[in-house]
Every structure is written in C-alpha cells, then in structure tokens.
C-alpha cells in the first residue's frame, strides 16, 4: 500500500507516533488509509449538509475494512458571489480545489480518496485532482435542492434572479419579490434545475466516478446517505483491486459524458470543465468533439431553465442511468466505474419511468444536442450557446452591437432601460485573463429575461454563463478581449450576426478593418493583486478549458 510510505519500517517510528496521536490502533495501521475530502460549509446551501454525507462515507470505509481520515477544502456559492467582485474567484477556485486535494493526498500518502462535493467548481476541481493523482478515487455529489413553491407554482433560484428585472419593469410587486426571495431555495442541495452543479454531478456519474444514481438523488433523501455509505465501501474495493482514476477517465468516458450532456441540455460550463478534466487525465478532447456530438445527439430532457422539469423530476424518472439507457446504442458501456464494475450493468438495472421527463430518441425535445459550438470572425477559436434554453425564433439574429467593458456596466444599462429590441449586447474583458476569472453573466441575462427582452435581444461575451441562463446568450468567445481577440475591437453599432443552425458568429466588418483596429488596440490597465494576479498570468483560454499553464 502507498500508505506504507508513512507507517512501515523502523525509520517510520516517529511517523507512527504522530498517527497514534490521532488515535490509531495496531489493527488500523495494517489497513488502507483513505482520505475523505469534506467541503462542508455553513455559507453554501449546496454544502451545508455535507457533514452528514461525509459521516456516511466514513462509515462505509470502516465497514469495508479501511481507515477514513477526514480532510477539508474550500467551497464557494456562485449565486452568492454573482455580480460582485467575488465572482472573479469562482472559476479560479476550481484550480484551488484541485491543488489542495493533490497537496493533502500526496503529503500524507493516502491509498485513495473520496471527495464529497456539490457546487459548480468543487465537482470539477475534485475530478481534476483525481485525474492528476491517478489513485483510486470516487466522488459523492451532495444532491439537488428541492424546488420551492409560490402560489402553487414551482420556483427556484433563477426565478429570483429574473424577478429583479420583472420588478424593475413593474411586472411584480415588492411583496411578490420578497415572497420569492423567501421561498425560492427551501433547503440544502445544489440549485434545483439542470444548472452547472447538477450538470457536473450528472457528468461525474456518466464518467463512472460516482455511484449509481448519485447525481439526481436529492440532498434531502435518505438514499443520498446510502449512496455515500456504498461509495465508502467500494473505494476500499478499488484500492484492493488497484483501480485508479485514469482507468475510468478514458476518452470513451468523456465522449459518453458529452453525449449525455447534449441529451440533458446541460450547462455550457461543462465544456470548460470536461476539457480541463480531460487535460489532467491526459485524454485528447476538444471543442470539435462537442460540436460533432451535438450534431448527432438529440436533446431528450426539457430541464429547467429550458423547460419545466427539475432534478427531482429527473430522479423520479430514473435519473442519469435512465437517460443513458435511452442513449445506450451510442454509448461505450463496456468501460468500468471507479470500483471496477461495468457501466453496462448500471444501465441494465434501470428503466425510464416518465416519458415526459426523458423523451424517447424518436420524439426528442430537439433533434440536436442542447449545446452548440459557434465559430466565425468574432470567435475564431470558438464560442458556445445553450440551445436547450433558446427559442427557435432566436436561432438567427442580426442587430447592432451595444458594447460594454464589464458586467456591471451592462447590468446598469439593461436595468436602466437602455437596451432596445433587436440589439446585441456585447460584454467583454470578462474572460479568464480579462476578468480575471471569467465571471458568469447571470445577472444581465436574467435581467433581460425578466424585462421580456430574451426573445429580441442577444448577448455575446468572453465571459461565462450560469447553468441557469436562458435565451440567445453566446459565451466563451475565444480568443478573449484581454488577449487580443476580435471581440476587443467591436465598436458600438457594428452589426453582429448569430446563426445557430450554421454554427456562425460574425461581426459585419471586413478582415482588413478588424486587423487595423487590432493593430491600434492595447489591453486595458487595471490593478489586480493576490491570487487573481497569478491566475491572470497563468490561465489559458476558454477553448482549452481555462486551465493553468
């Protein structure tokens, strides 16, 4: 066992003395040492129950003959950080999670680990660490939040964001706004729709790094604790069998994850995260894979924000295994999960229980996948749009650019009534390096929706979007403005064309004119300190997953 590095031999007497100080017995010294990475937090709804989930994982490890050691790393709530300077730390926190897990696992020579995570950047951060370390590893995702209820209608956090615009337009009263605030998020778990956290939980399950039906099992269900306990038992099996993360995280696993992502209509953030995890696993993956699989995979689940269904509905319909069953002919099901079990076994033991929630391939929500990759002179290295939450009337749009150099400027203009139907809102210098941190533009996009402009105004940015964003919103424009991408020199009134069916994003400016503008362009000067300064210097583009060099 790898943990022998700290517990075997005469020369390890002082090491064992320190372990004895932690209460270890002779019997435990002979067993596998398993790190249990807890991301419990009192300020993050998706993580405020993970102390109990962690205890269940530890119980499972003990039942199987291992020795659990609880360690911690950070957790952030994107919703709380949204539209503040704090949101600049969201995407960079993914790298911190990966680095801190790597650090503690390597320093203390654990034989394997289980990470208990829920929210947007914590899930991919844990997966990146698993791929990097290539040890026996498993993930337990904390589970979705239940939807709230107002006047008999189900609501969630995105309703609260969109209500701000509706209130500014006089569509709802202050009392209605406050009631939504009180009821949108009724308890623990990751926000109730197919937003980023839940999409990444689904990707984790498809990859084989979490237990059967872990992703859709709500945070409030006792089944979540049983899944956690079972994961603890099976990580000990993985250690005994020598199954490591890269045995699971193959190219076939990533292709399956992308295909299921397209069927679910998941968050565009999965593009960033799957590219980053694949890079850590030394697996070749690119935007071209997303583009190809988007063209040939139907969108099967009308999940919020692009439809009426929540994660609770997906859970009742059979969860991720049921979606995989519908796609089984196109998936690589002979690969293994983190404990060495066949993925085919998972699919064969499930069934689709609700055909409204999980549509048959012959009768999909859309013929093509829920995320589309765009190219053009405005995005030479690509951009993404979530068609699962886009009305077909906005698949083509042409309009004058209204240009902003920050999210705050754009939000003020939108809420101030300065955007007209037909416009294309351009928000730049919000990319990985430019922000720095590639903030999510949920506040401006939600404001457009709340003000009834989502069927007539497009938004284009080198920043990101929340998984809760809906409407004609194009993100991840690459190269980003701060690194000299064409979006840096778009001028007020330039005509921008979006054509989803043709996969194009263009600005109606001749190449020679764009080149001339870029020759005169200089990046803006701003003062960035601390971690964000180091992040800006090291981060790659969105088309590469915004990983560090």
From Swiss-Prot:
GO MF annotations, alphabetized: 2 iron, 2 sulfur cluster binding; dihydroxy-acid dehydratase activity; magnesium ion binding
GO biological process, one term: L-valine biosynthetic process
EC code(s) of this entry: 4.2.1.9
Keywords of the record: 2Fe-2S, Amino-acid biosynthesis, Branched-chain amino acid biosynthesis, Iron, Iron-sulfur, Lyase, Magnesium, Metal-binding
Catalytic activity, as annotated: (2R)-2,3-dihydroxy-3-methylbutanoate = 3-methyl-2-oxobutanoate + H2O; (2R,3R)-2,3-dihydroxy-3-methylpentanoate = (S)-3-methyl-2-oxopentanoate + H2O
Keyword Iron-sulfur: yes
Function text: Functions in the biosynthesis of branched-chain amino acids. Catalyzes the dehydration of (2R,3R)-2,3-dihydroxy-3-methylpentanoate (2,3-dihydroxy-3-methylvalerate) into 2-oxo-3-methylpentanoate (2-oxo-3-methylvalerate) and of (2R)-2,3-dihydroxy-3-methylbutanoate (2,3-dihydroxyisovalerate) into 2-oxo-3-methylbutanoate (2-oxoisovalerate), the penultimate precursor to L-isoleucine and L-valine, respectively.
PANTHER family referenced in this protein's UniProt entry, alphabetically: D-XYLONATE DEHYDRATASE, D-XYLONATE DEHYDRATASE YAGF-RELATED
Family: Belongs to the IlvD/Edd family.
Protein name: Dihydroxy-acid dehydratase
């Amino acid at each position: 066992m790898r943990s022998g590095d700290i517990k075997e031999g005469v020369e390890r007497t002082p090491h064992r003395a320190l372990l004895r100080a932690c209460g270890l017995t002779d019997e435990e010294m002979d067993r596998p040492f398993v790190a249990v990475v807890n991301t419990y937090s009192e300020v993050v709804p998706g993580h405020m129950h993970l102390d109990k989930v962690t205890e269940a994982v530890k119980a499972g490890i003990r039942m199987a003959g291992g020795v659990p050691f609880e360690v911690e790393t950070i957790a952030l709530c994107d919703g709380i950080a949204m539209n503040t300077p704090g949101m600049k730390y969201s995407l960079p926190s993914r790298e911190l999670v990966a680095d801190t897990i790597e650090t503690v696992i390597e320093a203390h020579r654990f034989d394997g680990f289980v990470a208990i995570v829920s929210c947007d950047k914590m899930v991919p951060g844990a997966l990146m660490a698993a791929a990097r370390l290539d040890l026996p590893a498993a993930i337990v995702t904390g589970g979705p939040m239940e939807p709230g209820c107002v006047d008999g209608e189900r609501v969630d956090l995105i309703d609260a964001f969109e209500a701000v615009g509706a209130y500014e337009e006089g569509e709802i009263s202050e009392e209605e706004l406050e009631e939504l605030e009180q009821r949108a998020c009724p308890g623990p778990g990751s926000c109730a729709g197919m937003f980023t956290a839940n999409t990444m939980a689904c990707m984790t399950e498809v990859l084989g790094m979490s237990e059967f039906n872990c992703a859709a099992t709500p945070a409030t269900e006792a089944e979540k604790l049983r899944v956690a306990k079972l994961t603890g038992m099976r990580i000990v099996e993985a250690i005994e069998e020598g199954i490591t993360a890269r045995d699971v995280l193959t190219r076939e696993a990533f292709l399956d994850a992308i295909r299921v992502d397209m069927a679910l209509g998941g968050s565009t953030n999965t593009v960033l995260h799957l590219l980053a995890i694949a890079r850590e696993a030394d697996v070749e993956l690119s935007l071209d894979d997303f583009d190809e699989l988007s063209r040939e995979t139907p969108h099967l689940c009308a999940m919020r924000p692009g439809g009426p269904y929540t994660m609770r509905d997906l859970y009742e319909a059979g969860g991720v295994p049921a979606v995989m069953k519908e796609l089984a002919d196109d998936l690589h099901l002979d690969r293994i999960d983190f404990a060495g079990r066949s993925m085919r076994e998972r699919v064969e033991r499930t069934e689709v229980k609700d055909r409204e929630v999980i549509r048959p391939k012959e009768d999909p929500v859309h013929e093509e996948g829920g995320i589309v990759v765009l190219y053009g002179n405005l995005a030479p290295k690509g951009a993404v749009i979530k068609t699962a939450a886009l009305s077909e009337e906005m698949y083509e749009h042409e309009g004058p650019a209204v240009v902003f150099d920050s999210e705050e400027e754009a939000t003020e203009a939108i809420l101030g009534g300065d955007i007209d139907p037909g416009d294309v809102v351009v928000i730049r210098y919000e990319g990985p390096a430019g922000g720095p941190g590639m903030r999510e533009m949920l506040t401006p996009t939600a404001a457009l929706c709340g003000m009834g402009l989502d069927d007539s105004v497009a938004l284009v940015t080198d920043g990101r979007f929340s998984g809760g964003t809906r409407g004609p919103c194009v993100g991840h424009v690459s190269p980003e403005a701060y690194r000299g991408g064409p979006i840096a020199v778009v001028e007020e009134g330039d005509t921008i064309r979006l054509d989803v069916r043709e996969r194009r994003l263009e600005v109606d400016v001749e190449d020679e004119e764009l080149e001339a503008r870029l020759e005169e362009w200089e990046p803006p000067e701003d003062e960035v300190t601390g971690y964000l300064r180091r992040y800006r210097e090291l981060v790659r583009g969105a088309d590469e997953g915004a990983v560090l060099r």
